[in-house]
């Protein structure tokens, strides 16, 4: 391409002037980069929906999956994404990063080269998958204590019905409980740390949106001066200052010290900072900003998603108040059967083994999540090499791909939601049934299936494959403990719903932007302490 330009008469004229020649060379280089790395590949696939239909993406996913069940189709987003048939999950879900990449897609979405968001953090993943999951029972007492502290702090005495913005209150409680496990007290309760773990996610989105305002060729020169980028740097720097005393104390401990056993849980004592540092390579162990970045990334991945799940569940509960009684009855039955402990303030705590016995609550959480997932698709990746599919299609490098999980979770042809698979009294998947998965687990052979944290071909909210969410078991416990506290000790209703009649039509509408689903941040509820709180 370059030689053709300079072999022409115009090219020879341009070449006689160094400045023009340099400019022409730059144009050639930019054109090459655009064609090679940025231009979206053209695909001969059906297109479902119209460009700009941001609010209808969810509808188009279902329509496309049912119209084209055996072939990929395109959602004309910016950039476009190819939705793959669910039947080919197994040939894609465990492909290596040099074929399809979750990490590269996340880096693309958040402009990792400018923001640092999306860098691979193997030490964090390993600490969650190996250590946090293995020692998960040891987190339960602290979670229960912190949930009670969070409710008291955020809602106060509340002897009479008092209005609250639901999402923002839940967000702070989730951040408190997450911090209790991830950094421990007293830092987890310090307002600065709490605010940073909450705002980091929102500031990441602001930074991404700020960069998007500039054409791709200009970003390298402007991003370093953006205040949104400076804010991310501040989070990491200041986070490092706050974490350094904890890091230094942890590193100073004798690595061969005798392990302490938690008398209440029977589990080996440990903390997440210890586990994280154990897997951190080389000199990075001594870098408090690296530790801070891991903590911020952890908050990015967990705090808002768990807060959304809790908020959705509460909104479903207050608009379907018929579920209060069976969920509270289950809590009382489990508490009577297993016993309980009483903390220093006289409050009852469930036994560690009781959490997994709350099957009706687990079912309600899963059904709420089925209707209100954080995203309408799963398995989002970008092709890092040409991808040949068994459908006969070849997707070129640079193609974004996903699976239509929202349709899977609402399609009566999906085995889990088919009448043949379910017990008598089957509820079609387009209708809400808070005890759907409880009833399935009552069937012989299905006792351990269909849990909130389940990840398989037909349960895709947490992903499925080599990037399945490693923290889903912790999230399930955290959400369950928060909802159990609400059910045992609080009355809650939609603001103005004095008779507590509810009604699904009164539920504040979710916010849907492209593929992302979030609860309405303006949703208001009224709360008061139950007269027989435990």
UniProtKB/Swiss-Prot annotation:
GO cellular component: membrane
Pfam family, one: p450
Record pathway: Secondary metabolite biosynthesis; terpenoid biosynthesis
Enzyme class, broadest EC rank: oxidoreductase
A single GO molecular function term of this UniProt record: heme binding
SUPFAM superfamilies: Cytochrome P450 (SSF48264)
Keywords, sorted A to Z: Glycoprotein, Heme, Iron, Membrane, Metal-binding, Monooxygenase, Oxidoreductase, Transmembrane, Transmembrane helix
Statement on biotechnological application from the UniProt entry: Ascofuranone is a specific inhibitor of trypanosome alternative oxidase (TAO), and quickly kills African trypanosomes in vitro and cures infected mice. As an essential factor for trypanosome survival, TAO is a promising drug target due to the absence of alternative oxidases in the mammalian host.
Carbohydrate attachment residues: 466
A biological process term (GO) from this entry: secondary metabolic process
Binding site for heme: 469
Major location category of this protein: membrane
EC number: 1.14.14.-
Ranges annotated as spanning the membrane: 13-33
Catalytic activity field: ilicicolin C + NADPH + O2 + H(+) = ascochlorin + NADP(+) + 2 H2O
Induction trigger: Expression is induced on AF medium.
Membrane topology term: Single-pass membrane protein
Localization per record: Membrane
Cofactor(s), names only, from the UniProt record: heme
Known role: Cytochrome P450 monooxygenase; part of the asc-1 gene cluster that mediates the biosynthesis of both ascochlorin and ascofuranone, a strong inhibitor of cyanide-insensitive alternative oxidases and a promising drug candidate against African trypanosomiasis. The first step in the pathway is performed by the non-reducing polyketide synthase ascC that produces orsellinic acid by condensing acetyl-CoA with 3 malonyl-CoA units. Orsellinic acid is then prenylated by the prenyltransferase ascA to yield ilicicolinic acid B. Ilicicolinic acid B is further reduced to ilicicolin B by the reductase ascB.
Family: Belongs to the cytochrome P450 family.
Name of the featured protein: Cytochrome P450 monooxygenase ascG
Species name: Acremonium egyptiacum (Oospora egyptiaca)
